[in-house]
Amino acid sequence: MCGIVGFTGEHQAAPILLDGLSKLEYRGYDSAGIAVRDGSADAEIIKAKGRLKVLAEKTNDGESVKGTCGIGHTRWATHGEPSENNAHPHASDDGNVVAVHNGIIENYQELKDKLVRKGYTFYSETDTEVAVKLIDYYYKKYEGTPVDAINHALVRIRGSYALAIMFRDYPEEIYVARKDSPMILGVANGESYIGSDVPAILKYTRDVYYIGNQEMARVRKGEITFYNLDGEEIEKELKTVEWDAEAAEKSGYEHFMIKEIHEQPKAVSDTLNSVIKDGMIDLSEVGLSEEEIKEISQIYIVACGSAYHVGVAAQYVMEDFARIPVRVELASEFRYRNPILDPKGLVVIISQSGETADSLAALRESKKQGVKTLGIVNVIGSSIAREADNVYYTLAGPEIAVATTKAYSTQLIAAYTLAIQFAKIRGQITEEQYIGYIEELQTIPEKIQRIIEDKERLQWFASKQVNAKDIFFIGRGIDYAISLEGSLKMKEISYIHSEAYAAGELKHGTISLIEDGTLVIGVLTQPELYEKTLSNMVECKSRGAYLMGLTTFGHYNIEENADFSVYIPKTDPHFATSLAVIPLQLLGYYVSVAKGLDVDKPRNLAKSVTVE
């Protein structure tokens, strides 16, 4: 959730650190800070509460802080309130050790009490300060190397961490360690870079190392050495990131979110082209063999947030096409309920970042039970990608806005192609149906583009909703899955209370919430359910609701009851989610803009939820 950057090289560090932190703002934060070393001098630490621009102003955009080695951090408060005092970096009592940290140290109070007995004092409420002083304690006690001191400290820490640490005795070096919290290291032109996510360093290098779980690294100028927690050197392969640095910039758009909405046709096309070869779906790079697919008796889709909504839509498609029972679960619930998994099942973990804490824990629980796993992730080399038995990479590219758009759309494509291929291999569809589904999928990017080009009507409608108190989304079947995502988009960026309901459940209590003027958005993309959902909408209108209908071209009778109608191109009903979600993304976006809110960085939210 927080962001970490680091740099050691020939250039001045502070401007690079601030630039890197700006690329991590989407992760969410309430304060920020940097620490820079100028040769053998003590580290200069500058911290600020609030937006990164406050820190930039305090440092004259980094120009007033001299030194070629440094670390930086954006903090999301977990231990201690948002304040300059609690912001990172933190230092030992004598300034010997300075560090930044992502994660949660669960036994920090126990460790803190021990350090107080040893004479240490504490100025903040954070668990990070405890880690810094614990490392300092072991560094002085054993008079060993930084790697030794870090190792002694980490074996006593319970919880998750990504640490970037500087030692006074090693002025041009940074030491890194991680457990269950992401970190990436890059090298270029005799300089080294550290980031908790790829965009932080993408401007400077595409040559990166992925530090593994419970590993450490010694970062020098253009040189990185890796260690296990026993202090033994280990080898790492240098990887090349394919993402374009331009993709992490706004490129003339007002917000990242609207840019990423516009990027969806290409992202969907790229993801389709990655698995469709000569008109056929090829899952060889995903890793699942035909024999394994034939043996699957149950599919468990486990995810959080929007990725969970992908799973809800995928359940309908997978069961319809492949005739395999599918269970969709929230990762935060799955990991704690002692699940009973079929040994011949397949657990599918969906996560844009590949680092979502609950999803990663669910993956590990599944592997512990010996069940085959598949990760659908966007970030290459992420924890889920490395630990899953098989991985399906979506090609959304960097997604900066907190509210997902293109990553969601590419996850849907992954689900569709898996369902179609599973159905073919298991003999549930004919060759003609197989080809027909693939051909229809290949029309999706162009149809998304057509919807985006007609956004002005939605922009006008959104401007009328800025004072809405409640908005309800209703649908049946796949339309319910669409409603879930539309509702989340609305509430997370416009701050309007919004809920999604299965339309058939309205009469079981929900309809009592309808008042005069309450906006009810009905999603009607499934032909066999159209009349039933329309009937539910009419029932809402009779109680004073203001209706918006979202359906496919041709269903113009919706206008007899809806106060505002939105149409999407026709497609196979199984794939309707890919089209119907676009107007709902645009609606949430334009309502937020009309209210003057921070679209890309909504309050209290983080892009990558890497702690519980």
Language-model-detected regions and their locations in the chain:
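Conserved short alpha-helical segments that host acidic/polar catalytic motifs at enzyme active sites
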Residues: 1-250, 254, 266-297, 336, ...
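Catalytic-loop motifs flanking and including active-site residues across diverse enzymes
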Residues: 127-130, 310, 314, 410-415, ...
